[in-house]
């Protein structure tokens, strides 16, 4: 199965990315405060096919942020709304004059336009920054995780930046996501999972009894009731995927499996909209495409970037898989349409062997039956069953027999033995009925006397 790939150099370190349609995605990053010559920017890129059946990446538009501000650290987008996390310059933050670290842009398909910004954290420490930004599917809510101490997460209305709830998480938030229906927000620390209601702001389910030998890294809702978590071993190589049900206010582990023993850490994860592929970025700058159907690594792209991978994203139609890096590069993979459901060589070989074994076993059974004349026994058995079924048609039917002495009613039983018994009973009934008939006739018609007896009586 052939994959087409393209490596594209943007020109500045990248820290956030999101598809805005099937073939366009926005990236953000920059050199940060004091890094002269490397801008802080947002850029919209378009991916498509080029001549020779390859891939091409083109720049659609960009927007440059103030040069003295910090570099953007997080991004999410829904529809035409783009939110980024980006601190203002450190002098302003320290002065207490505010830090508009959440900024909103609009994309109309041709250009990016800055719309507004707000200070959610109210921090005067320039080291505090926005770690994660997530928008709900309909764009009506946003969740923002901060690095400040104590660690916290805020749920806001992105239209006016009003804070609905602020939650102290206790430990650094590794990742967070909204459920598809937007009623829940889930986040993980390195050792716990917590699900919060976006309606009440209270915790609805929590899991803290994970194996102490693993470190939770990334998470995403598979649907409204199930969460996928990616984790690694704390002291050895290995990547694990775990599916957890949160239905009915309790957590249930559906499955947990190690999918690779070659990598030490995970830097990014995404699940496609069809929920059949998972993309993972590893600590050695490789990208894994994992099939959820059987939890197998379908394809590994080794060391596609020269520096840390900061984000991986699927296109809405699952045609493209994109990874971005602090090495200023974008790597695009075009995924074959049948890849998620395809079988590997080992799977195909195993299936062929199983089918062959089943055919040989069936042939052996049929041959043994033929040698032992079992087919004749089976045929005779079904014939006997058919014969019994045919005789049963007479079961419980009433029969009438007309004789010289009257009508006799008999009941025929459903088996031959009972039928013979019934005939005997009927014969007895005939004799009894005959005797009764003769007696009745003698009473009704007296016996005629001889002439001699008649004369004697007259005398």
UniProtKB/Swiss-Prot annotation:
Keyword Metal-binding part of the UniProt annotation: no
Keywords: Endoplasmic reticulum, ER-Golgi transport, Glycoprotein, Golgi apparatus, GTPase activation, Membrane, Protein transport, Repeat, Signal-anchor, Transmembrane, Transmembrane helix, Transport, WD repeat
Transmembrane spans: 352-370
Glycosylation sites: 435
Lumenal topological intervals: 371-459
GO molecular function, one term: GTPase activator activity
SUPFAM superfamilies, per database record: Tricorn protease domain 2 (SSF69322)
Cytoplasmic domain ranges by topology: 1-351
Gene Ontology biological-process entries: endoplasmic reticulum to Golgi vesicle-mediated transport; protein transport; regulation of COPII vesicle coating
Gene3D superfamilies according to UniProt: YVTN repeat-like/Quinoprotein amine dehydrogenase
Task performed by this protein: Guanine nucleotide-exchange factor (GEF) required for the formation or budding of transport vesicles from the ER. This function involves the cytoplasmic domain of the protein, which is thought to interact with the small GTP-binding protein SAR1. Required for autophagy.
PANTHER family per record: PROLACTIN REGULATORY ELEMENT BINDING PROTEIN (PTHR23284), PROLACTIN REGULATORY ELEMENT-BINDING PROTEIN (PTHR23284:SF0)
Protein name according to UniProt: Guanine nucleotide-exchange factor SEC12
Organism: Candida glabrata (strain ATCC 2001 / BCRC 20586 / JCM 3761 / NBRC 0622 / NRRL Y-65 / CBS 138) (Yeast)
């Amino acid at each position: 199965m052939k994959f087409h790939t393209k490596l594209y150099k943007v020109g500045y370190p990248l820290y956030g990315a999101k598809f805005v349609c099937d073939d366009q995605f926005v990236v953000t990053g920059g050199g940060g405060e004091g890094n002269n010559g490397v801008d802080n920017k947002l850029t919209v890129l378009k991916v498509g096919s080029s001549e020779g059946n390859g891939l091409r990446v083109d720049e659609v538009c960009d927007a440059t942020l103030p040069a003295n501000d910090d570099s953007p650290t997080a991004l999410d987008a829904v529809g035409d709304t783009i939110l980024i996390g980006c601190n203002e310059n450190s002098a302003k933050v320290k002065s207490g004059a505010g830090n508009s670290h959440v900024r909103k842009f609009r994309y109309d398909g041709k250009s990016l336009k800055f719309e507004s910004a707000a200070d959610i954290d109210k921090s005067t420490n320039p080291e505090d920054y926005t770690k994660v930004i997530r928008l709900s599917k309909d764009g009506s809510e946003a969740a923002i995780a901060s690095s400040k101490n104590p660690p916290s997460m805020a749920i806001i209305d992105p239209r006016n930046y009003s804070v609905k709830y602020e939650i102290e998480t206790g430990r650094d938030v590794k990742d967070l996501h909204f459920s598809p229906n937007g009623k829940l927000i889930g986040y993980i620390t390195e050792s716990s999972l917590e699900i919060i209601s976006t309606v009440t702001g209270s915790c609805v389910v929590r899991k803290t009894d994970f194996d102490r030998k693993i470190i939770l890294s990334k998470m995403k809702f598979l649907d409204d009731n199930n969460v996928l978590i990616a984790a690694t071993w704390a002291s050895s190589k290995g990547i694990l995927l775990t599916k957890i049900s949160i239905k009915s206010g309790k957590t249930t582990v559906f499955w947990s499996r190690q999918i690779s023993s070659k990598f030490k850490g995970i830097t990014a994860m995404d699940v496609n909209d069809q929920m059949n592929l998972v993309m993972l970025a590893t600590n050695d700058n490789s990208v894994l495409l994992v099939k959820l159907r059987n939890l197998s690594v379908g394809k590994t792209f080794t060391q596609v970037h020269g520096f840390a991978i900061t984000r991986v994203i699927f296109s809405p139609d699952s045609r493209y898989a994109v990874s971005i890096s602090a090495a200023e590069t974008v790597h695009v993979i075009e995924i074959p349409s049948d890849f998620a459901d395809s079988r590997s060589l080992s799977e195909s070989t195993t299936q062929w062997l199983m089918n062959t074994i089943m055919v040989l076993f069936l042939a052996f059974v049929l041959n043994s039956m033929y040698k032992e004349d079992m087919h004749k026994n089976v045929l005779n058995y079904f014939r006997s069953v058919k014969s019994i079924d045919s005789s049963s048609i007479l079961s419980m039917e009433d029969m009438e027999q007309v004789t010289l002495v009257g009508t006799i009613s008999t009941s025929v039983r459903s088996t031959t033995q009972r039928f013979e018994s019934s005939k005997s009973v009927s014969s007895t009934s005939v004799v009894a009925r005959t005797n009764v008939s003769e007696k009745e006739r003698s009473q009704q018609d007296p016996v005629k006397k001889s002439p001699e007896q008649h004369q004697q009586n007259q005398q």
